[in-house]
């Protein structure tokens, strides 16, 4: 019994030290963590969520209402040619996003971290460029009648060009299914009673399909 009396204080003392050490460690770690809000404004969270939904749906006209000081990007314009429609549909249909953590305070307002995933359209475009040149040459060489390739002025027929590009786009999409992941931070500011996202290069990049040129 005497042994237990001596050991118990030691055990409780050790537990106290460990608890204190854990508290200090947690406090130190929290210094480097973003100041997450216990009760974030629902309208700010909705703004970030709705913007990303619009981007994933390819509804850029609707997305504009959640952006602050949007430059003239003509986001409401959709591709009109078959190749553009095919590529853009493939990109938007593959798009998805995840809100990482919650809103946290910044010097200018609030911020929300986001993980965005979509088809690597940049890789598809580069593959399409190579394929188009190969198919273009093959189409000319295999044509039984030059009128299928050239018009009366000796220029390449527009339908021949478009058919070649469309074939190249389809093959490039079939050969390239790689996804690309982007992590970005949406910066939100309160303006005229509404929360708006300040667009930056990372956001513009996913809006433009991640194409680098």
What are these regions (language model features)?
Residues 134-156, 172-213:
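Short beta-strand edge/turn micro-motifs at domain boundaries
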Residues 81-85, 164-171:
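Short Pro/Gly-enriched beta-strand edge/turn motifs at strand-loop
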Residues 117-135, 176, 208:
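Short, cysteine-centered beta-strand-loop-beta hairpins and adjacent loop/turn segments enriched
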């Amino acid at each position: 019994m005497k042994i237990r009396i001596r050991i118990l204080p030691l055990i409780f003392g050790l537990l106290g030290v460990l608890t204190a050490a854990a508290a200090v460690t947690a406090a130190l770690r929290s210094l480097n963590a973003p100041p997450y809000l216990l009760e974030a404004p629902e309208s700010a969270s909705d703004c970030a969520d709705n913007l990303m939904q619009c981007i994933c749906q390819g509804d850029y006209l609707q997305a504009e209402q959640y952006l602050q000081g949007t430059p003239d990007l003509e986001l409401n314009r959709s591709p009109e040619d078959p190749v553009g429609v095919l590529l853009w549909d493939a990109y938007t249909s593959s798009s998805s996003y995840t809100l990482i953590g919650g809103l946290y305070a910044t010097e200018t307002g609030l911020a929300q971290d986001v993980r965005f995933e979509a088809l690597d359209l940049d890789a598809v475009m580069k593959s399409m460029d190579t394929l188009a040149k190969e198919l273009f040459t093959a189409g000319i060489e295999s044509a039984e009648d030059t009128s299928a390739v050239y018009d009366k002025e000796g220029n390449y027929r527009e339908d021949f060009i478009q058919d070649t590009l469309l074939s190249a786009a389809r093959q490039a999409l079939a050969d390239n299914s790689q996804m690309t992941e982007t992590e970005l931070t949406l910066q939100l500011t309160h303006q005229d009673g509404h929360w708006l996202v300040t667009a930056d290069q990372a956001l513009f990049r996913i809006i433009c399909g991640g194409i680098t040129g």
